[in-house]
Amino acid sequence: MLKKYLFLTKPGILFGNFITTLGGFFLAAQGSIDILLLLLTLIGTTLVVASGCVVNNVIDQDIDTKMQRTQNRALVKKTISPTVALVYAFVLGVMGFSILWFGVNGYAFLFAMIGFIVYVGFYSLWTKRTSIHQTVIGSISGASPPVIGYTAVTHQFDVAALLLFLAYALWQMPHSWAIAIYRFDDYKNAGIPILPVARSIYRTKIECVIYILLFAAVLNGLYCFGYTNVFFLITFNALTAYWFYLSIIGFKAENDQLWAKRFFLYSVILITLLSLSFSFTYQSPAPNLPLF
């Protein structure tokens, strides 16, 4: 019984957002970790993300029946009712937002709210079914957790927070498209107008190259503005260079699905290593460049 409710929250997404929240927190903390604040930030963010994922499951019931990857979800199999799922999402959301508001700060609460509203409203209810730009919209919600982690410590939105937001949003474009290429038939059967389906796999590969270059350019800004050290500069660019290499060899791939799987898995490794590296690649003291 409990397993059904756990999988309703999409544990893979929870883990990914847990890591990126941790990364933002590490960068801001500069080695001085407030354990209680860290725990409250991680728990609050995870609960909010879990709430959004449960609501997404409710919204996507009709789509999930058409996709092999999602045909066994609890709402599709009707082992959990939509009403129970929404109550579950409400409880998770109330707990998560309360922790961020009362235990962290208004900035963390604000960016959690932005991420939730974009994911549930603008992505799940609207653009996922209607627009080729759905991934751009969805990337806003995916880029919120590192900013939540960062502002939990700094109590302000500064240049580093902006760079984190932009970089993590840019990373999500090729990451998400790789899933769509790997599961191309699923997305096509469900009628989801994501780029590989709505345009072509070749066009998607071109845009993956562009977004990887933009991702690298933006995140190098952390070093240029003095937020990270030279070790970050070297290791980040080495890791990203290999991702870029994978994007280039994709044009000669004999099997697009196998290439996309490899490309996707490396994107996960990259963002995980990047986020964890902020625990020791920060530059202290960091510049004070607040935006609001």
UniProtKB/Swiss-Prot annotation:
One of its GO terms (molecular function) is protoheme IX farnesyltransferase activity. PROSITE patterns: UBIA. It catalyses: heme b + (2E,6E)-farnesyl diphosphate + H2O = Fe(II)-heme o + diphosphate. GO terms for biological process: heme O biosynthetic process. GO terms for cellular component: plasma membrane. The chain crosses the membrane at residues 13-33, 35-55, 84-104, 106-126, 135-155, 161-181, 206-226, 231-251, 263-283. It is a multi-pass membrane protein. Keywords: Cell inner membrane, Cell membrane, Heme biosynthesis, Membrane, Transferase, Transmembrane, Transmembrane helix. Pathway: Porphyrin-containing compound metabolism; heme O biosynthesis; heme O from protoheme: step 1/1. CDD domains: PT_UbiA_Cox10. Its EC number is 2.5.1.141. It is found in: Cell inner membrane. It comes from the Bacteria. Converts heme B (protoheme IX) to heme O by substitution of the vinyl group on carbon 2 of heme B porphyrin ring with a hydroxyethyl farnesyl side group. Carbon 2 of the heme B porphyrin ring is defined according to the Fischer nomenclature. NCBIfam families: cyoE_ctaB, PRK04375.1-1. PANTHER family: PROTOHEME IX FARNESYLTRANSFERASE, MITOCHONDRIAL. Belongs to the UbiA prenyltransferase family. Protoheme IX farnesyltransferase subfamily. This is Protoheme IX farnesyltransferase. It comes from Acinetobacter baumannii (strain ATCC 17978 / DSM 105126 / CIP 53.77 / LMG 1025 / NCDC KC755 / 5377). The gene is cyoE.
